[in-house]
Each structure stands twice: as structure tokens, then as C-alpha cells.
């Protein structure tokens, strides 16, 4: 086996072949790098301007299709990467599978992936040519008001980091943003995190959106304490990542609520102690005499979960009497398309949010991350609980993960065997089969799918 000093790395291959220009601020790649990559998109030597590649593009009101694009010269903080793998997020299935969903501009589909840096703009400082990187769902500039207050998932420079199109489809400008259903990714460095690992790309890709979200809800925003009870609604890729985060943090009981049978089985495999089918607990009625109090319902699922979390004693002077779990994680959301597996009691996802609030104990924590609820849908909360209660609620689509801080930690957990993303990345598709990958995600016949463009 070759020693580390003699082993050829991506960075060594690319930087050896590069020609430094602009005081070393950008790297231009030569043909020898192309030969080393074996099958990468056509590579030029002029700061990538004019380079051609294929991508899955959404334009006008039609369905996305694989198109040939041309790279514009890199500017500012732009980073160009050869894509290794990208995860198909469920939130994109309507854009990909339903004709007539409008878009204001031509865009590369997807948000986040794994790749290797092949060129950088003149102002890039945090990554180099040859780096293996994660392109994250959220930007993290590290300088704005929100980033400085440890809420990089709400970075204020996210939209500004990609101000214009980065490539062209004939005479049509195309915006790349963080789209990774493409042979190349082009985005700003605020979205890019170098990682130093040889783990399979398909597994790392699960961290770019869903995995990082689930782990964030149990490990960062409202971290689970050792020996606590956790209830997780939903066993998709977000929920199953949350299961593993709760296990890593030392939860004693991890209860997963999920209507799909095979996902309940996977939840047990990944660390859940109990699984519950919500379709077996559909009884819900307002408590007699409750009047207009919003949260006075008798819900059979909520009662069952409370019973599972019941302490061994009700003696409050002996530390007992808690009602409900310590932590609740909501990872359900609304159905965008009808699944081909078991359906839950409410396809809008609103009932789950209501049940989470009712289940939460007086001093418990609730983390929510779902999207896709019908416009105008409401969750009812009593005024007294809202104004004078002690429940804690942590919302956010990123689950609280700081991508540039936490991605490397999650990779380390994968390397040590504490975090299993292989089970979640259940099926892999080439770029030409991207629509089929999204269809499988929409059908929910597998936990998650991955596209490997190159």
C-alpha cells in the first residue's frame, strides 16, 4: 500500500495541473487533470468560461430535463465543483414531477451535494482547488447579524450569495444556486464546506439537507440529554437522522411515530426503542366542558405516547410526576404527492403539529422542521399556554445545524460507525434518471434516493 506521502490525491492532481493567475487567487486546470479524473465534463483552461456540462434544468412551466449548459467565467466568491453525488429532497418532487408548476427563471434542480473543487473565483478564501466539499442547503457567511448569534441556518447573506446566473443554455441564462443535479455545481463559498474523508459520496450527500436537519434537531438547537425520553414523528430521512442523533446523545427511550411499516423497522434498526403506527390511534374528540380552549382534546395517540413515557413513580417529592416526553421532534410535513405505501391520518401534516404541542410536557422541548402544509393552515394553542407556559419550541427548516461548523463533526461520526447514512441512501441513479429518482422519493418506496451525475 502506498504511503500517505506518495498517494495521489485529488488536490495534488488538480493543483499540479493548475496554472496560477491573478496572484494565485484562481486556479485554471489543464488537460492532464481531465485524464486523471476519468470521465469528468470537458475541461478548459480559461477560468472555466465556456466549459460545457450537463444538468437537470427546470425552465418555464414544463417538466425539468437534462440539458447541455455553458459555464460563465467565475467571479468573486464563486466555486466550481465536479459533482459526485446529490440527495433528492422530497420538497422538490412537485417541481420535478408535476407539469405546470411555474418558475420565474431557468434553474438547476436540487439544493446541495458532494463534489471536488475544480476552480475558484478571485475572492475565495475558505476552500482550494482539489478540496472535497459539501455544498450545503444553507449559506453560512459567518459575518452577518444572524451568523454571529449562532443561527447560521438563517444567514442573511444566503440569497445575496448567488446574485445572478452562472451559466447559459443557448441564449437562456441559467441560475445554479446550490443545484447539484448536474455534472458541475457552481455556487458561492458561503455554501461550501471542505471535508477530508474518503467516505462514499452517496452517504455524505445525505448530510447536505435532510441528514443535517435531523441531526441538528437532536444535537444542536435543543440537544437531547442523556437518559431522556424522545418522541420523533416521522421516519423519513430527517426523522431517521434524528433517531441516530438522539441515540448518540444518550437518550434512554426513543419512540418513533410512523405509518409506513418498513420505515418503522428501519427506525428500530437505527436505534429506536419503540415504534408506533399512528393509524392505530385515530380517536380524537374535544373534552366535554372545555369550551373554546384550543388544546383541550382527548387524542388517543397523545395519550398512548404519554403512557409510554410515564415515569416509575407519580410521587412528585421523589422526582416523579412528569407527563410526556422530554423532547419531541417533528419531521413529517405535508404530502406533495400521494405515496404508494401506507398513508398517515392527515396528509396535510397539520394534525401532527397539533399533537406535538398537546403531547409536549409543561417544561418539555419541541423542535419542528416540516414544510408543505396547506396555505392558511393553523395550529390551535391556548392563550394561557402561549403567554404563561414553559414549553420550548425550536422551529427551523435546517434543524439548527450550522453547516460549516457541524458537517465535519457529522462526517467524523460516520467514520467511527456511530452514524449510518448508508441505510438512508437506499438507491442511486445516474443523471439521466433523475426524474425516476424523484419519483421513488415521492412514492416513499425507499427512504431516500441519490443522483450520481459523474
Label every PLM stretch briefly.
Residues 196-292:
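Mid-domain Rossmann-like dinucleotide-binding core that forms the NAD(H)/NADP(H) cofactor-binding site
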Residues 72-87, 98-148, 153, 194-199:
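Glycine-rich beta-strand-centered segment in the early N-terminal region that forms part
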Residues 70-71, 104-110, 173-177, 184:
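Short Gly/Pro-enriched turn/cap motifs at secondary-structure boundaries
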Residues 143-233:
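NAD(P)H dinucleotide-binding glycine-rich loop of Rossmann-like/cofactor-binding domains
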Residues 222-226, 249, 270-391:
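Glycine-rich cofactor phosphate-binding loops and adjacent beta1-alpha1 units
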Residues 28-68, 77, 82, 292:
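C-terminal segment of N-terminal export signals and the immediately downstream linker at the start
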Residues 54, 112-114, 132, 146, ...:
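Residue-level marker of beta-strand positions
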Residues 2-51, 315-316, 322-323, 354, ...:
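C-terminal hydrophobic helical "lid"/dimerization subdomain
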Amino acid at each position: 500500500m502506498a504511503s500517505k506521502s506518495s498517494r495521489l490525491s485529488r488536490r495534488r492532481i488538480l493543483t499540479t495541473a493548475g496554472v496560477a493567475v491573478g496572484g494565485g487567487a484562481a486556479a485554471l486546470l489543464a488537460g492532464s487533470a481531465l485524464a486523471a479524473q476519468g470521465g469528468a465534463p470537458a475541461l478548459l483552461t480559461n477560468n472555466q468560461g465556456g466549459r460545457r456540462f450537463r444538468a437537470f434544468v427546470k425552465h418555464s412551466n414544463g417538466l425539468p430535463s437534462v440539458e447541455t449548459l455553458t459555464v460563465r467565467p467565475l467571479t468573486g466568491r464563486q466555486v466550481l465543483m465536479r459533482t459526485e453525488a446529490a440527495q433528492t429532497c422530497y420538497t422538490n418532487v412537485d417541481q420535478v414531477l408535476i407539469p405546470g408548476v411555474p418558475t420565474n427563471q431557468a434553474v438547476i434542480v436540487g439544493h446541495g451535494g458532494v463534489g471536488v473543487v475544480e476552480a475558484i473565483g478571485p475572492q475565495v478564501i475558505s476552500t482550494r482547488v482539489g478540496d472535497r466539499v459539501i455544498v450545503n442547503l444553507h449559506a453560512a457567511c459567518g459575518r452577518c447579524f444572524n451568523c454571529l448569534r449562532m443561527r447560521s441556518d438563517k444567514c442573511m447573506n444566503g440569497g445575496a450569495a448567488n446574485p445572478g446566473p452562472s451559466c447559459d443554455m443557448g441564449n437562456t441564462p441559467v441560475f445554479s444556486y446550490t443545484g447539484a443535479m448536474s455534472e458541475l455545481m457552481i455556487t458561492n463559498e458561503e455554501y461550501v464546506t471542505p471535508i477530508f474523508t474518503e467516505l462514499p459520496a452517496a452517504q455524505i450527500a445525505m448530510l447536505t439537507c435532510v441528514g443535517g436537519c435531523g441531526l441538528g434537531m437532536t444535537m444542536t438547537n435543543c440537544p437531547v440529554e442523556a437518559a431522556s425520553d424522545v418522541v420523533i414523528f416521522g421516519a423519513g430521512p430527517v426523522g431517521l437522522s434524528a433517531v441516530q442523533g438522539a441515540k448518540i446523545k444518550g437518550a434512554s427511550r426513543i419512540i418513533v411515530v410512523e405509518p409506513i411499516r418498513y420505515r418503522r423497522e428501519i427506525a428500530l434498526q437505527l436505534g429506536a426503542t419503540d415504534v408506533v403506527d399512528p393509524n392505530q390511534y385515530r380517536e380524537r374528540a374535544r373534552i366535554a366542558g372545555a369550551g373554546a380552549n384550543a388544546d383541550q382534546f382527548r387524542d388517543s395517540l397523545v395519550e398512548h405516547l404519554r403512557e409510554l413515557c410515564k415515569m416509575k413513580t407519580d410521587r412528585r417529592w421523589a422526582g416523579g410526576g412528569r407527563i410526556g416526553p422530554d423532547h419531541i421532534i417533528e419531521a413529517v410535513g405535508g404530502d406533495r404527492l400521494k405515496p404508494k405505501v401506507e398513508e398517515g391520518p392527515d396528509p396535510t401534516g397539520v394534525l401532527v403539529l397539533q399533537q406535538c404541542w398537546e403531547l409536549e410536557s409543561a417544561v418539555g422541548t419541541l423542535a419542528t422542521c416540516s414544510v408543505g402544509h396547506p396555505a392558511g393552515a393553523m395550529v390551535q394553542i391556548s392563550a394561557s399556554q402561549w403567554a404563561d407556559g414553559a414549553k420550548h419550541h425550536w422551529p427551523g427548516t435546517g434543524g439548527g445545524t450550522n453547516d460549516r461548523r457541524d458537517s465535519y463533526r457529522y462526517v467524523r461520526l460516520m467514520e467511527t460507525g456511530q452514524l449510518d447514512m448508508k441505510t438512508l441512501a437506499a438507491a442511486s441513479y445516474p443523471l439521466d434518471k433523475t426524474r425516476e429518482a424523484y419519483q421513488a422519493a415521492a412514492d416513499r418506496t425507499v427512504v431516500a434516493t441519490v443522483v450520481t451525475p459523474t
